[in-house]
Amino acid sequence: MDGCGTYLDTMRREAPLVQCITNFVAMNVVANVLLAAGASPAMVHDAEESGEFAAIAQALTINMGTPSPRWVEGMEAAARGATAAGRPWVLDPVAVGATAFRRGLGARLLALKPTVIRGNASEILALAGAETRGKGADSADPVAAAEAAAQRLAESSGAVVAVTGPVDFVTDGRRGIRCANGHPLMPRVTALGCSLTGIVGAFAAIRPPFEATAAALAFFGLAGEEAAKTATGPGSFQVAFLDALHALSPEALDRGARLEAA
């Protein structure tokens, strides 16, 4: 896929407002990642306003990391509000296969028609109803093992599905693309997966979801590669990663994106 830099340039010029219903662990990191990339985060999650706010925002992201009954009400209200207003929304089904509570929540959110679903291989397998070896929020399954399930899930839900790992896979049920950008230090920092969901939301706000998701993955992964050039470990990597998101130019993204048709 060509032209990732154009997607980045448009996202930065429009600075979309992204409503993020994410978890306690990730909230600060996600907000800083979106700001560094050029978007505008809003951490609005309470059911009293989440649905109304979803109609104002340009995109919504819902992360299942630390659900509670009240937060679930906010998630469902926001998803309904985004869908009614024609806003794209991204589902991050964190540890969806771990408990009956999470499986039920994942099924209800899936029924509310997300635009994009982004998860690791075990999460996508579980959401698709397939066997998985996941352990909590971590994946014990390789991306390749979830590609067929991702295609089925995309076909049945109408969503673009992104399976993220060392080499990411994105599908809309008809087309597929792989992204090889990224660095081994990225999984050593908490909330980067949650932050990637936020970036996918920012790109989906201004581009068709399949292309937007692929461009977002390339941008995020390439920023990780750039950050690793100066980092000495996970601590310094966090700071360097924010700087790389801010500094990465559309031209550099065009040169460095490693995307190929699947």
From Swiss-Prot:
Biological process annotations from GO: thiamine biosynthetic process; thiamine diphosphate biosynthetic process
Top-rank lineage group of the source organism: Bacteria
Sorted UniProt keywords: ATP-binding, Kinase, Magnesium, Metal-binding, Nucleotide-binding, Thiamine biosynthesis, Transferase
Cofactors, names only: Mg(2+)
InterPro entries noted in UniProt: Hyethyz_kinase (IPR000417), Ribokinase-like (IPR029056)
Role of this protein: Catalyzes the phosphorylation of the hydroxyl group of 4-methyl-5-beta-hydroxyethylthiazole (THZ).
Protein name from the UniProt record: Hydroxyethylthiazole kinase
Lineage: Bacteria, Pseudomonadati, Pseudomonadota, Alphaproteobacteria, Rhodobacterales
